[in-house]
């Protein structure tokens, strides 16, 4: 009887301890989630409004017209430039809306989808990558060159026995008032989504950290991290970026850097990977819904991310060698 009472008291104490840890995780996470949400929305809302103005005034269409010859070199219709440009300044959803307004065959849709998955939301996502330790200009170049590398590869690898359909961009005929109201409503929905997702994600991250799950996940993923050229400390942020994307995953990435759980040099390596390979669940599925095969949207981006990291490591090694030689010659 005494042993049962002792065991019962011990179990009760453990439950109380677990509850205290959970409540503590929630209390610690909410202020940080609010700060990250405020920072993210302060970028997203003004940028989306600026893009609304560029689209309404026809500036995006004019710029895409100048870029059309570059896309034709990859076997894509000239109007494809408008799709990628829209993706760069906005998001995947808008890019899909533009694609579905064009008469494109499956091969072209697949190439464009893969390029958009690498190059979208440049302003917001580059701000995230910069805040976690990378050069903004470098990240822009990595993503832009990466999207064209993917486009060239898929143009070479995909079957070429399909004929390009004639395409034509549908001109925006909506009044500014209608466009503004649509933008305002979508911005409200986006804000709610950002607040909810980031708050829940920050709470989850803190709970996993308190109960030691993150360390366990890091050990399990260690072999894959070695292949990818990424440090073990980046494993959880890598999972978050590949499931939720950079915008929603930014809270975790920033938190880990600020708390010293991930060195900025390690975060920079991670950023080189996730710059071209992130959000490997929802975004590819959205394009799959309009006919693009998932394999061609996921695997090439992952392999490109691995290649970019190893190239970055090679660059760092060469710089260290040059610095060592210069110091030696100076002595």
Regions found by a protein language model. Name each.
Residues 2-70, 144-153, 157-226, 303, ...:
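Selected transmembrane alpha-helices and immediately adjacent juxtamembrane segments
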Residues 19, 23, 27, 31, ...:
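Juxtamembrane/transmembrane-helix boundary motifs in multi-pass membrane proteins
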Residues 42, 46, 59, 86, ...:
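Hydrophobic faces of alpha-helical transmembrane segments in multi-pass integral membrane proteins
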Residues 50-60, 94-99, 154, 209, ...:
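Juxtamembrane "helix exit" motif at the C-terminal ends of alpha-helical transmembrane segments
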Residues 77-134, 228-287:
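Alpha-helical membrane segments and immediately flanking helix-loop junctions
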Residues 86-100, 135-142, 163-171, 192-199, ...:
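Juxtamembrane/interfacial segments around transmembrane helices
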Residues 93-115, 141-153, 173-174, 180, ...:
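Alpha-helical membrane-embedding segments
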Residues 119-174, 282, 287-319:
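Transmembrane helix-loop-helix hairpins in multi-pass inner-membrane proteins
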